[in-house]
């Protein structure tokens, strides 16, 4: 008689993976979680808010996964998956509450899947949110052996009168950039076109490991800033680089004037540019060392930079806002 295992689906391996994943997920639980993993749905109690607005986001890791396949490294992309979601909802002042993941593969290997969820768990702990559920799909014949995809979904909350939507942005506001940890999770199709050997040396490390450096999670730093300062707008620098993402914080007609020499560009970007990419295209593709941008009053800028650095991240005054137009001007 034919079995599910004959078709390429190993139910026992799935049970093993779930058992391992549950341990990592449980480490993330906050007081809002009101049921255990294994139910048909995750539940989260919302209390302590006057007029709460739920803020949601979903994202994946893109073709950065291809490098993870080659390097046989699974945990860091789990952090990436969380970071891409929580940093997006953070732009509106939302505190992440809970997260769900989706993992799909051709052949499930429990230990590797658990490593991936360990990374998701680490990311959730860093962001202060709970991993309350997920789906692991074994799909034989759909993915090549050793390959998988991962996506995430998060929900956060902000008081209605505290939503940051760019409506307070004014002419003359200062733009502060917080450092990235590297390329983060965008632009990897171009990276993979230019770099073929991920074992080659780059400043004493395998370049594949450098490229797999996890996306920085800005949640703790930014939520503390919001308590102390009036933040007019925020942008997570992802696909499309400076040109696409900074204008997303503007409600009206404004131009972001960016001073290119005002912040440190990590060596990995200079290396990519040396392989034949024009500087303008770099800023339209990558974060170039700035993963998150704040728009603030000029009189608050220096204090905010000092506070960010006290929290452990480098920050720079990278430019300012000018009335008129709608885009980015690099100088």
Curated annotation (Swiss-Prot):
It holds the Pfam family AIRS_C. Its EC number is 6.3.3.1. It comes from Clostridium novyi (strain NT). GO terms for molecular function: ATP binding; phosphoribosylamine-glycine ligase activity; phosphoribosylformylglycinamidine cyclo-ligase activity. GO terms for cellular component: cytosol. PANTHER family: TRIFUNCTIONAL PURINE BIOSYNTHETIC PROTEIN ADENOSINE-3, TRIFUNCTIONAL PURINE BIOSYNTHETIC PROTEIN ADENOSINE-3-RELATED. It catalyses: 2-formamido-N(1)-(5-O-phospho-beta-D-ribosyl)acetamidine + ATP = 5-amino-1-(5-phospho-beta-D-ribosyl)imidazole + ADP + phosphate + H(+). The gene is purM. This is Phosphoribosylformylglycinamidine cyclo-ligase. Keywords: ATP-binding, Cytoplasm, Ligase, Nucleotide-binding, Purine biosynthesis.
């Amino acid at each position: 008689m034919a079995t599910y295992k004959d078709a390429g689906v190993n139910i026992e391996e799935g049970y093993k993976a779930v058992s391992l994943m549950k341990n990592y997920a449980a480490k993330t639980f906050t007081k809002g979680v009101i049921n255990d993993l294994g139910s048909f749905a995750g539940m989260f109690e919302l209390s302590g808010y006057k007029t709460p607005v739920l803020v949601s986001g979903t994202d994946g890791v893109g073709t950065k996964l291809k490098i993870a396949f080659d390097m046989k490294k699974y945990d860091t992309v789990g952090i990436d998956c969380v970071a891409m979601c929580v940093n997006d909802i953070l732009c509106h002042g939302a505190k992440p509450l809970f997260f769900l993941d989706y993992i799909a593969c051709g052949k499930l290997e429990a230990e590797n899947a658990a490593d991936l969820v360990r990374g998701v768990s680490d990311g959730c702990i860093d962001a202060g949110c709970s991993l309350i559920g997920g789906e692991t799909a074994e799909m034989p014949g759909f993915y090549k052996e050793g390959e998988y995809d991962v996506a995430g979904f998060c929900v956060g909350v902000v008081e209605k009168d505290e939503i940051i939507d760019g409506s307070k942005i004014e002419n003359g506001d200062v733009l502060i950039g917080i450092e990235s940890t590297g390329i983060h999770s965008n632009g990897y199709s171009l990276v993979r076109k230019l770099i073929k050997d991920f074992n080659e040396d780059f400043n004493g490390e395998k370049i594949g490991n450098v490229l797999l450096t996890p996306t920085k999670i800005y949640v703790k730093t930014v939520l503390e800033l919001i308590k102390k300062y009036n933040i007019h707008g925020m942008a997570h620098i992802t696909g499309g680089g400076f040109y696409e993402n900074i204008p997303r914080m503007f409600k009206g007609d404004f131009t972001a004037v960016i001073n290119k020499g005002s912040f440190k560009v990590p060596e990995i970007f200079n290396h990519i540019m040396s392989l034949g990419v024009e500087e303008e295209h770099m800023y339209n593709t990558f974060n170039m060392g700035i993963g998150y941008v704040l728009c603030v009053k000029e009189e608050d800028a220096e204090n905010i930079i000092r506070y960010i650095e006290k929290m452990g991240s480098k920050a720079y005054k990278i430019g300012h806002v000018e009335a008129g137009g709608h885009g980015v001007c690099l100088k």
